[in-house]
Amino acid sequence: MSSNTAAPQFLTTPEGLSLHYTDHPATGEEQGTLVFIHGSGPGASGWSNFKHNIAAFQMADYRCVVYDQWGYGKTDKPTHIDHTLDFFVDGLGALLDGLALQSVTLVGNSLGGAVALGMALRQPERVKQLILMAPGGIESREDYFAMEGIQTMVKYPMGSPEFTRDVLAKLLTLLVYDEDSIDEELIEERWTTLQTQNSHVLATMAIPDLSDQIGHIAQPMLIFWGTEDKFCPASGVWKMLKGGGQVQAEILNQCGHWVMTEHPELFNTRSLAFLSTSASH
């Protein structure tokens, strides 16, 4: 499923900010709700991150809510607020409140993984399970900025003349193991979205190292990580496995930062098996 047929919807937070999401109903009798939380980067959005996955979960009778985080996609891009983990978790909380969702499964990639962990730590009663792909918030800022992908992402400010389409194309190839999988359609999709972004989100982003708090998360957790990840060190998976709790992991070679895009069938199948067998919190 590569085209988004769900109507764009918006909710307004108590602070007056607008948050964009799409709501994809279960095909049959609903088994639960999954909220998909995308990662960071130029041109990122919820649908761009998860367009290869939503249909499989709908067909398995899960309601899927896909939203754009602050500073991304069609959601507001405030320049007067620092983009801390708390601010991103506030956004997720506003979404859950606005849709009257009491307890959901969180599916998060990269920054989205850190936000999912942040919500599980802040309001554990609202999180049933977690499915995370190379989550952020597991290393120090210095460790992340030593990664080739992060260095490339922050070299030129978003919206600056130096951040050209070719720079974006190069960055996208770093997200995956197979560079040939980055086609013109994806580059154009991200480039179009990038035109609406500003540099404030990356300039003020502050995500703490949560690795020493993993043991406080009781919910079942499934983690995917590619060994060729150039953005989040694959060694982070061992921190999470050793951190305690109910943690399972799928480690893939010949895979970069985008497991759900590079290996969608494996990701979808393994995630659905996890959802059906893991105990609810």
Predicted regions located by residue number:
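Conserved loop-alpha-helix segment in the C-terminal half of the alpha/beta-hydrolase fold
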Residues: 216, 220-255
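Catalytic active-site module of serine/aspartate enzymes centered on a nucleophile-bearing elbow/loop
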Residues: 246-281
